[in-house]
Amino acid sequence: NTFTAYGNYENRGKARTRFMQESLGKDGLISAFREKLSQVMKSESLTLQPSELLQTAPIQKETGIPFADKRIISQKQAGLYAVFYQPIGGNLTPDKAACLYHLIEPMKDVEIRLTPDEGLYVINCSASEAEKVLKATTDGAQNLFETSVACIGASICQVGIGNSPALLSACIEKVRKENFADGVLPKIHISGCPSSCGTHQIGTIGFRGGIRQTPDGPKPAFAIFEGGCPLQGQEVISDMGKSIEADKIPDFLVELGKMISAEAAAYDKWIAANHDKFIELIEKYTA
């Protein structure tokens, strides 16, 4: 109801709830939502019958044990674990989905929960079940950089320009050979065009697809964004920087990783003290 009343129907690119705060302001959006909520509560019946409520009972499984692998997370319920799995680029193939289904189908109360960043959690696992799920998902992201996000890309999207999944795969393949420590390179966000499906503006490093004119003719390129943040209260929408040709971006990230590794640092600490070096590296790859 709030979007119907206040959403942008003139500009298709801004026909999203996230743009309502821009047009109404933070307080205005809260006020508009409360106004519509009040109307719905007066006009609709929200009374629930006890028979409609989901009856649940505590899940009982064997005593838990500690795990060293970061992808296994202890749940708040004693003895239960969640296993994080992110297919590279969020591309969960039908065969892999079937494999996961057949693996967890006999596991009592085990479920899959999806994340907004193309990953998933297999929850309510016992210790032994968590180990089985972990072994079955070794093809996914193994560190922060490999959890990077890419939109579906121009090979499928009719609007897109850049092939985001191909770029991400090339970057991960190149970076893996360097064996950087976890955290040396941040999670990146890649969109194939200005539609922002890869949410490049909120990425620590983001790339947005386009075309760059070169002496050899037009080539696929991605404009770089840096310093974005999606955390509540710390939100930053980054500005667009220069464009780097797509086939040079894996080398750019490898060189960046080597610079950071040389100082035995993680990206977030390094960039705060070495932003000028980061800009110099961008200039090198956009010259």
Regions found by a protein language model. Name each.
Residues 1-36, 206-265:
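Mobile "lid/hinge" segments at catalytic clefts and subdomain interfaces of large enzymes
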